[in-house]
Amino acid sequence: MLTPIPLLQRFFSSPLSIKEILQACDRIGIEAECSNVFPDSLNTVVTGKVLSTSPHPDAERLSVAIVFDGKEERQIICGAPNCRAGIIVPVALPGAKIRNALGEVTTIKKSKIRGLESLGMCCGADELGFPHLQTGERGIFEFPENTPLGESACLLLAGASLECSLTPNLGHCASLLGLAREISFLSDTSLTIPEEFSFSPLPQESHSCDTHNLEASPVFYSVKISGLSWKQSPEDLQASLIALGQKPLNAIVDITNYVMLSLGQPLHAYDSQAVDQKSLHATTVRSPQQLTLLNKETYTLPEGALVVADQHNILGLAGVMGSAASAYSESTTEIILEAAYFLPQAVRKYQRTIQLHTEAAYRFTRGIDPQGVLPALYAAIHMIRALFPEAQISPIQKIGEYKSDPLSLNIRPKTLKRLLDLSLSPSEIAEKLSPLGFQTIAEESSVRVEVPLYRHDIQEETDLVEEICRTTPFVQKTQKILPTYTPIYALKRSLSTFLADSGLQQFFTCSLLDSEIAALSLQESSLIPVQNSSLKLRDSLLSGMLKSAATNLNRQAPYVYAFEIGNVYSKEHNQYREEEHIAILLTRQVMDDSWHVKTPLSFYTIKSWVEKLLCHAGVSIEDFVLQASQHPNFHPYRQAALYHKKQLLGVFGTLHPQLCKKSQIKHDVVFAELSLNVLLSLKKKTEPHYVPYPIYPSSSRDITITIDKDLPADLVRRELLSFESKWLESVHIVSVYQGKDVTSQSKNISLRLVFRDHERTLSGQEIEKEYERLTTLLDKNLANIGKGNS
């Protein structure tokens, strides 16, 4: 946003220096810089005030001036006829280089003129490179009375401007008034409204309209103005618009643009001849409509789009742009001027649909001040009346009423302490927020805050904490080192370091997938693409990683060992969810450099990586159950799902051959994807501790049993471990057999039970007795194993 300093200064009760304005912008959170750059030699030409003058004792045409340059008083010998006490002039300090009357560059030095010391020079505009600003007889340039002292004179002469980059939450600063209001809160000045925007109310008439959409446009004003003609706006208005970055067009359009850029309220003028019954309102489109806008482009407005219309025709897309058919033109003698409050979401949705970005849409989509609609309309009407004295103004037509109460929030000292480590009482918090335009009531343990209607960015307690943060000097802020990361961040950092140290490369792929990459997945997504785009949010890390792996392999990478940590999105029961996942992808054959043997990738390769990952995360593999899964992206017989009770942690296995073919990868790919949110919830908080090596021997016994072929052998192993036994140390699966002498619906599994006592050596009789007890319990419970597990 281009912001001319002279225009901005008019909104301050006392002028601020450019440095003070830039410092205030930094505290607001606005990236701002001065757009005019001059040679260093001219940076020492500053504004100064002539305090007194007296005739030179030895020169009739010279005077001795005492000038204050913002820092100190200095004596300057001046020959300009207009040098007098009280004026503010450009003062070239020693070291500055200016052009003299002959056009030669002269360096200003401390010198003596006719016996008196001169510590600088009072300059004319032409001597600083601005001859077009020099008026009348040759003399020194005079600045306005409220010009701050010590400022760069060249910046002021050039009409210095700020280039401001506004973040989306600073929509209330997208005008001279809004920016000046925020700067005044954070500096030693107060906000004042220039006379050109201070007008008394005008007559109004309220009326209703059955088709007006009060939800999307709570209040809508329109006024008929006749007796107009086509003409250009005055030079000073054109100059102001140019300084604001707008091209002057004609008087009416220039006024609406100037009011919008100054006060933040978009306005639009319609040719009255194009408006049926001279009445406007905001309504929604019931079916798709074609509309040609002012830019001569034709757009298809979707059903539900908010538009400005009369009784029969659509005259513009509300908050974005008017139609070409209703545009103000050279033949227009009567207009209907519209000013309204449109809800940000009502404008944002359909403005994005047609991909049209305008100055009006920029402000409406971020939220305007609903209390500023009528004052902006008054300002435009009075400016039009000043340019067209014969114009006739009809009473303002009003539809609706903005009745929304200000948002009320509570801010607690303990929240401030937790987030900023600032210890403030409720009364101190209220003192910090009140100067920012908030209405505050300090209570016993909190502060009740009413948010101004123009602050659409303040929605919760943490937003108020941010307001206090930006008004607190750095020297008062905490010396305590706050936690640098959250538990989920610590887990991500730990796992990424572990996997990188294990030889895997980290991938970073985009959360938005185009149709080509999204099509790599065989799973149907529950998310729909972004409007007017083939992009959609990913529901898995797989597609992006596959695309990256294929790119690396096509560039002759011998293999791809990679992992990624990122967000995935899903929709369940009309609720959108965002989770953080971690994925591992391994493809192509792996070469063991020590033996030069190629080891094929398999289901068990990725299973071992999952086990190592869980172990490093501080989660025991014993806490999980492996179950068969039917995920469409995996080989139907080489995949598994990992569950903790009924909670799914993730899936892993060999990818489906068809998926590899679609990705143009000729080798097997194994893949695992786990939920970091679930993993964090299961992470044990105990610190690692030392377990001594056993000094007494163990003894093992094997057992072979027949179970249902669909029952996982691991469930039987876990069942044995669940029995209370002070000697059973571990249970291992030795073999699983299906074939001869075993029915087609059954399988044999062999388990090895390891017994040990850490205080003595067990006897064979003790082991046999414990073995018999455990196998008897297993026989009794065998029928119930697997029931209730999912």
From Swiss-Prot:
The keyword Cytoplasm applies. It is found in: Cytoplasm. Residues 694-790 form the FDX-ACB domain. CDD domains: PheRS_beta_core, tRNA_bind_bactPheRS. It catalyses: tRNA(Phe) + L-phenylalanine + ATP = L-phenylalanyl-tRNA(Phe) + AMP + diphosphate + H(+). Mg(2+) binds at D457, D463, E466, E467. Transmembrane segments: none annotated. Keywords: Aminoacyl-tRNA synthetase, ATP-binding, Cytoplasm, Ligase, Magnesium, Metal-binding, Nucleotide-binding, Protein biosynthesis, RNA-binding, tRNA-binding. Residues 404-483 form the B5 domain. Residues 39-154 form the tRNA-binding domain. GO terms for biological process: phenylalanyl-tRNA aminoacylation. Its cofactor is Mg(2+). PROSITE patterns: B5 (PS51483), FDX_ACB (PS51447), TRBD (PS50886). Binds 2 magnesium ions per tetramer. InterPro entries: aa-tRNA-synth_II/BPL/LPL, B3/B4_tRNA-bd, DNA-bd_dom_put_sf, Fdx_antiC-bd, Fdx_antiC-bd_sf, NA-bd_OB-fold, Phe-tRNA-ligase_IIc_bsu, Phe-tRNA-ligase_IIc_bsu_bact. GO terms for cellular component: phenylalanine-tRNA ligase complex. SUPFAM superfamilies: Anticodon-binding domain of PheRS, Class II aaRS and biotin synthetases, Nucleic acid-binding proteins, PheT/TilS domain, Putative DNA-binding domain. GO terms for molecular function: ATP binding; magnesium ion binding; phenylalanine-tRNA ligase activity; tRNA binding. It holds the Pfam family FDX-ACB. The keyword RNA-binding applies. Its EC number is 6.1.1.20. Tetramer of two alpha and two beta subunits. Belongs to the phenylalanyl-tRNA synthetase beta subunit family. Type 1 subfamily. This is Phenylalanine--tRNA ligase beta subunit. It comes from Chlamydia muridarum (strain MoPn / Nigg).
